[in-house]
Amino acid sequence: MNSLIATPPVPPHFYETSCRSPSYSMSSTNTSVNRKRKAEDDCPPSGDTRMSASPSGSPALHPRPLAPRHLKRPRPNVSGRPLSLPRLMETLDTDALRSVLRSLCDRHPEIASEVMHTAPRPSVSAALEVLSNYQSTLQSSFPLGGNPSSDYAYNRVRQHLTNLLEALNDFTPHFLPPNESQPSTSLSYLDGATDIIHRLPRWTTPQHNIEEYAATEAGTKNWQSTNETAGGKLQDALKRAQPEPWVDRWQTWATRATALRETSRRYANSSCRAHTVLAYRSKSGHGNSIQYQSSKPHFLFSTFNPSIHPSITALLSTPHYTVQVDGFRAIFNETITIPIC
């Protein structure tokens, strides 16, 4: 008996409406496509699929064109070059700059004249500092031990001594009238130059002291010319303002300065000691006090003992004046020279 066996019913698939993978076909049409199909190609996108997929054409995210970057590429062939003039000047010290400027002035005289007119006038402190440097070099060149006044010491320091005296002879005319119109500037320089002359070394051999004698005599001449100029200007100024009785004493300035020069010449020839007394008016109007500064006996402006020099005692009896021994340090002073042989 032919009976049909009832097949149990197949329950429907849970995702009935979901897409099923297409059956794989080996037809020639499918092989010509040669690509794997995806589920998204046949199935309508669900809500979950739409949320997980990234938007392809969002209107809020338009691609912005980037500006081209101009990169400075290193040059393949970099060659060296010398420094510019300002940078080169920054690397030079004072001595190197002085050497370069001196060589330029020697090769080009027109540059030398331009430098002379452009450079500022040297001050008294700058000139005395240069002279002090020469003197320090002289003192440091003495040999250690032994007699500092011997011929051996003289030969060791002779060149440095010559450099100091040459610098002194070059600087001094610059601060003298008529090149220097201010008497106070001239006297201030001469005061410092006199101290340098006083510190010159003294030698055992008399021939070696000729340079010191010449510098001393030149210093007295410079004091004479400067004192005459300063005295005349001061006298004219006081007569125009409020003349005083002691102004007339300035008329004897030139004579006493000449006596100082003669004394220095005798000092150089016969080893006389010259004592210079500077008299000026006391601020209180009277007084007979003595002020002095210690120095070596062989110096031109040396200290004195008034108890053994009666000629100085007579000067002390003059009222309204004070006696000072200080190597022409005061500007408004009168000079009296007392040679002691």
From Swiss-Prot:
One of its GO terms (biological process) is nuclear protein quality control by the ubiquitin-proteasome system. One of its GO terms (cellular component) is nuclear membrane. InterPro entries: Cut8/Sts1_fam (IPR013868), Cut8/Sts1_sf (IPR038422). The keyword Lyase does not apply. Pfam families: Cut8. Keywords: Cytoplasm, Nucleus, Protein transport, Transport. Residues 21-32 have a biased composition (Low complexity). Residues 1-84 are annotated as: Disordered. One of its GO terms (molecular function) is proteasome binding. The keyword Cytoplasm applies. It is found in: Cytoplasm; Nucleus. PANTHER family: FI02826P. Involved in ubiquitin-mediated protein degradation. Regulatory factor in the ubiquitin/proteasome pathway that controls the turnover of proteasome substrates. Targets proteasomes to the nucleus and facilitates the degradation of nuclear proteins. Belongs to the cut8/STS1 family. Binds the proteasome. This is Tethering factor for nuclear proteasome STS1. It comes from Arthroderma otae (strain ATCC MYA-4605 / CBS 113480). The lineage of its organism: Eukaryota, Fungi, Dikarya, Ascomycota, Pezizomycotina.
